[in-house]
Each structure stands twice: as structure tokens, then as C-alpha cells.
Amino acid sequence: MAKTNISPGMQQYLDIKKDYPDAFLLFRMGDFYELFYEDAVKAAQLLEIGLTSRNKNAENPIPMAGVPHHSAQQYIDVLIELGYKVAVAEQMEDPKQAVGVVKREVVQVITPGTVVDSAKPDSANNFLVAVDFDGCRYGLAYMDVSTGEFCVTDLADFTSVRSEIQNLKAKEVLLGFDLSEEEQTILVKQMNLLLSYEETVYEDKSLIDGQLTTVELTAAGKLLQYVHKTQMRELSHLQALVHYEIKDYLQMSYATKSSLDLVENARTNKKHGSLYWLLDETKTAMGMRLLRSWIDRPLVSKEAILERQEIIQVFLNAFIERTDLSNSLKGVYDIERLSSRVSFGKANPKDLLQLGHTLAQVPYIKAILESFDSPCVDKLVNDIDSLPELEYLIRTAIDPDAPATISEGSIIRNGFDERLDHYRKVMREGTGWIADIEAKERQASGINNLKIDYNKKDGYYFHVTNSNLSLVPEHFFRKATLKNSERYGTAELAKIEGQMLEAREESSSLEYDIFMCIRAQVETYINRLQKLAKILATVDVLQSLAVVAETNHYIRPQFNDNHVITIQEGRHAVVEKVMGVQEYIPNSISFDQQTSIQLITGPNMSGKSTYMRQLALTVIMAQMGSFVAADHVDLPLFDAIFTRIGAADDLISGQSTFMVEMMEANQAIKRASDNSLILFDELGRGTATYDGMALAQAIIEYIHDRVGAKTIFATHYHELTDLSTNLTSLVNVHVATLEKDGDVTFLHKIAEGPADKSYGIHVAKIAGLPKSLLKRADEVLTRLETQSRSTEIISVPSQVESSSAVRQGQLSLFGDEEKAHEIRQALEVIDVMNMTPLQAMTTLYELKKLL
């Protein structure tokens, strides 16, 4: 960046840019925001705007690009969406009154995690995450600057940190420590996050609870410091810090949520086709955000779940009142975001009108809730603060037709301020007064064509042609002489003109001051507004769940302490909604106290994955307090759900299907408890047949013997069905089929016992493969099945069985005993649970060489 022969203005730019090297600097110059040097070159490419230079004739012209100030937000949005930061430098004084270079300062740094204004507003949360590490545990804090939500927790390991960042869908992560190279790669390359750094802790006793751990305090304090440093103002809308524990919610990884299509469809990345889409009958932006939060974090507290259920039941039982409630909620605007705009000093008249309209609806909403006459609903009603004094202030102060911008005037209602009313009367009636003066002087002077005109230089004046100069009255005074006429004024006209000019100038200034005063008054209500927002959002979500339950004929689930799963005629709620009730085939799911694993076999395309997802969605809906898609449901409370459903390679991180399978399986068996739910679909298909079968069997045995979690394990390894002989808590189920005249019909119903055939060739037939190919496949299958009849599948004892199984007559796995002894010794020293997937594969390869 050359600094030779630069102007004072450019020196000012360079001095400011030096403090913001990692951000695009938008430098206000008149009606444009300008960018210079490397910023200009890069912005011209990213924003598709023209690139020019400030001093074209110089030896080294300075690259320059600019955007109009009135449309700058859309360009800022593009840069933020691409993961960049933007520093906005404004003119801090009127250029006309400035001595020398106009004073400029950065007034805000906008980052992907601190977006408040946007040309394309989104109702979803935008969380900025901060992470700190004390050498033992991680502190993780997050904030939505646009709503003021502020939370913190502590986590045991980086895997949990990564999962929480993914669940929050953060775009920017603030770090208070140095990452390892592997962690840096994960966050930047795999998760595409913008990393920022902060060392200073912001201490605010009003926001941060002293009961937190040290690492939680530093994470939250550094987050606050970063937000204040970038926003450069006091933020009165920031809420008191809330501490939460991951264990207080049903734990699910981002991969699990994605595979279950909870908040967006994994295939389209759209809301349509997700559980969020199904359950969203909310009427407010606040309700939409809260619903998504409930889906992301189902509860584990039975008491809290039952409270939600009870209110939904009350709403279901009162259709008319619930309909009135839904209609009233339609008039509620986004109080959280409006409050933040007030706090940021960006609220315009339209924002205050929306706030006033919302407050006007609150008494009606409160009255409707009272009409339900229910103790559980009354708890919500008692906490509703209607803020009548604020509603009255806005209603009496802000003109209902006020423009969106403060500078246009016509903001304040007539009758609110006497001085403003006087000025408006002068402006409104002044033209009439001038017309009266014109008529009076025309008649008195006898100048028939006498008229009053106006221009900026001379103001109001009498226009008199040269032919009538002899008739000019004595009280006229000359203001200007033209070739064919003269311009005159009078004391009376000057007085009226002075009053009108004063009224115009003072009215605009006074109206601005009044609006600022009103906005400052509104800011004092922010805490009460935020509490009201939470209650209205909760009411909105509960009425939404009631509407969905009634529309789709859902039932109220029950919970037990017996570790029993009973789902009668259950449905996959989302698939049913897409297909239609008439087309969907329901399935019952049953786990008694003794059963921990269902091993499900059956052909592809027959409904195994849907059956598994059905159980997961039923659990999630039930534990978020929703009613569920079934005839009857009785569930234990789960603490976590682990899934491996789907076989897409993780191409971004360079991990194969098999590696992803093993990593997700490892997370499940390490973290699951006997109160967890595990869903594994076709685990082991990403490697060779015998490797896959061996690993699948070992994982099933491990879950059975050591974990005890309720598990559905879908497999195409039919040999694994023999495990039910030795594993007492495992039962076989299969997808039923109907064979008739050589054709196979998949019934999509789950039945007891193992499947007797794979029907893979029939699936290929449905897919339309050539007949000659199918015939050849059938011949090969027949030969393989014949060969397999003469080959015994060897049952390898698990670790809980006697190590002397070979001596008890079981077939030896190896041909000679010496080699078997060598392999047995190698196996005994392997610490499977502490091996990485790569180490496991290497060890397996070494063992294979011993055969």
C-alpha cells in the first residue's frame, strides 16, 4: 500500500484502515461509501461494481470503488454472507462547516456473527459463539446480537464444542485460546467458519452471574468485549446471561439432526420436508425461533414436558378460543428484533408503530387466554405485562402514516406537542396569509398584475413590471432590479416569510428531537418488552403444536419409568404429511424391559429406515412436549439419540463412508447410556463383506453387553440374525413381503422374526435394470446360496462369554492352533475403546496378515 504523495484525506483513510486490517473499510465521502487499495480491488470482484482510481494521472493511481450510501446495506449483506467483516467509517461533522479534512470515525464493525440490520431480514437466530479453554474444560458462550439472547455452558471436549457450534448454526466463532492444527482445519475448512480472536474480558456484573466457572466467565466476558468493541455503543437490549447444561436436554449431534431432517431437509437444505416445516403453524417471528429451539433441544424433565402437554390439551379442547388466539397473534410483530433496533439507535417511526400495534393486541390476547379458564394457562396469563403506558405513548405520539425515515418529517401526531402544532399551522396557513397580502396590495395599489413569487435568493417578493413602477406604494422596499421588472418586499410580507421559514426549519428539528425523546423513553421498557416477547413466543408455539395435533390427529404420549417402548400404529409424521394419510402404512414398535436391541432385516426400499426414523421423531416430538403421530404411545425418557442413517461420504473432510460410519459408531458406544436411543442403518456396508459383518457383530455385542441402550440395528447381513441365540436382549424383526406368481410386494410392515430373503434382485428389477442382467444375477445368487449351505457361519464368542469356548467343542476360527494362539495374544492386548478409527483399520490389517 503506497503512501507517497497522498492527500490528507487519504492519510486519514490509511490511519483508520490500520486499526481494521481484517475488514473491508467503507469510508463515507459525501453520498458514497468508498473503498481504496486492496479493499477496492477485491470488493469490485465480489460485489460486481466498477473499479476506478482516485488519481488517474499519477504514476501509481490508487484503486477505488464505491457504493451509494442509500443502498450500501445490500452490498454489506453480500460481503457478510461471504464471510467477511465490514468496518463503516462515517463523517462525524458537516463537510460545509469542517475546517480541513472532515472528521471521520468507524461507528460499527459488522461481522457474520453480529448482523443486526439487513436488506433481507431473516426471522432465524444468528448466533455468535465464543469458546475458551482452561486446559481441562471448554467454556462456550453464544449470543444473538439482534435479539439479545445470551447463554453459556461448559463442555468436556472439543467434539462436544464442535457439535454445539454446529447445532447453533453459527457463522463466526470467537476464540480466546490457540487451536491445534487439526481443530483449526475442522472449524475453518470443514465447517467454513470465520474465526475471530479476543483476549480481553469485559466485566459487567449486571449481565454475568458470578456463580459460573472460571472458563465460562472468560468465554462470556470475551464475547461481551467483542460485541461492544464491534458495535461501539451501550447495548441495553442484551439479556442477563443464562447458564445451561447440555445434559438438561435430549442430546443429539448435528449429524443426527441432519439425518432426521429436524430443521431442514438434508437433501434440499430447505425447510420444506423437515419436522420444523411440519410443526410450524406459528404466527410470529419470535414463535418461529422458539419452535426451532424446542426442536433442537427437546426436554428430559418429565415435569416440564407435562406442563407443555397440558396447555396443548387445553388449546385442543377449545377450538373457537384457540382460533381467536391464533388470529390475534397475527398482529404481533417481532418484539425482540424491534427492541434491539431501539437499543442500537436504529428504530424508525415504522418500527415504533409496529411495536405500538403489537402492544395494542396484548390485552386481547390476555383476555382470550383468561377465557380458557385453566390453571396451567393462567400461569402464562399472570406473567403478561401489557405495558399500557408505552402503548399510549406510541399511539398518541406517532402518526399512523409516518414514513420509514426520520428525516422526511410528518412523524409526530397533531396535538402531541404545542410548539410543533404552532409551526405546522404557520406552514399550513402561511400560503393563505401570503395570498391575502397579495390580494390586499393589488387592490390598494391598483397594479392589476401584481403578484407574489418566491426564490431561494430573494425569498418572497412582489413582482412589479417597469410599466407599473409609478404605482408602487411607499411602504414597498426594493429587493432586486431586473431588466424589465423590479422585486419588492414589505414589512408584513417579511414577517410572514420569517415565520414560515422559522416554522419549516424549527419544525423539522423539533420533530426530530421529539422522536429521539420518544425512542429514548421506549428504550427504558426494553427489559419488560423482552419478557413479554418470551411469553408471547411460548403461547405461539403451544398454539401451533395444538393446531398441528388437531389437523393431523395426533395423540398425547405417555411416559414410564420402566424402560418400555410401546407405540401402536405409529407413523413417520413428516413422511405421512408428504404422502397423505391414506397412502401411509403405520407400524407399531415395542420394546419390553428385557429387550434392548431390535435387529431388523429386509429388502432395501422396504421401509427399514423410515421405521427407524419414525421412532426417533416420535421420541423427539414427545420430549419437546408435542403430541405425536400414533394411536397410542408410552415411552421412557431418553437422554440422547445417536444415529447412523445414510451413506453419503464426507467429501469435504476427505472421509469415506466407512470412516464416517466408524466415527459415528464410536461416538455412540462411548457416549450412550442405558437411557439412550441408538439407530444404526446398514452399519459396515462401507467395507469388505466379512470386515463389515465382523464389525457389525462386534458392535451389536458391545451395545448388548456394555451399553444397554435401546437400539434398532438394520442390516443386510442376514447371518447376524443368529445372534438372538446368545444375546438374550436382542430380538429379530423384519419387513414383511408378499410373494405371488414370482412377484414380490413390499408390505412396509414390520413383523417378528428374521427375513428369509434379501430380495435385492427384485429391487434391481423395480429399478429397471436389463432382464439379461437380472437373469445372470439370479444364476449367480443360486450358485452362491448352494455353496453357502455347506459352509457353517462361525459364531465367535464375545468378551463376556468364556474364553475357553474352543475347548468346549466350538469350531476353531483358524486352521492350526499355533497361529490361533498368536492371534489370540494379539487380540487380548488391543484396547478397542481407546483406538482411533485409523488405528483400528491399521490393527485389523496387521491381524489379517497373520492368517
Swiss-Prot record:
Keywords for this protein: ATP-binding, DNA damage, DNA repair, DNA-binding, Nucleotide-binding
Xref: SUPFAM superfamilies: DNA repair protein MutS, domain I (SSF55271), DNA repair protein MutS, domain II (SSF53150), DNA repair protein MutS, domain III (SSF48334), P-loop containing nucleoside triphosphate hydrolases (SSF52540)
InterPro entries (alphabetical): DNA_mismatch_repair_MutS (IPR005748), DNA_mismatch_repair_MutS-lik_N (IPR007695), DNA_mismatch_repair_MutS/MSH (IPR017261), DNA_mismatch_repair_MutS_C (IPR000432), DNA_mismatch_repair_MutS_clamp (IPR007861), DNA_mismatch_repair_MutS_core (IPR007696), DNA_mismatch_repair_MutS_N (IPR016151), DNA_mismatch_repair_MutS_sf (IPR036187)
Nucleotide-binding is among the record's keywords: yes
Described purpose of this protein according to its UniProt entry: This protein is involved in the repair of mismatches in DNA. It is possible that it carries out the mismatch recognition step. This protein has a weak ATPase activity.
Family annotation (HAMAP family): MutS (MF_00096)
The name this protein goes by in its record: DNA mismatch repair protein MutS
Species of the source: Streptococcus pyogenes serotype M1
Lineage: Bacteria, Bacillati, Bacillota, Bacilli, Lactobacillales
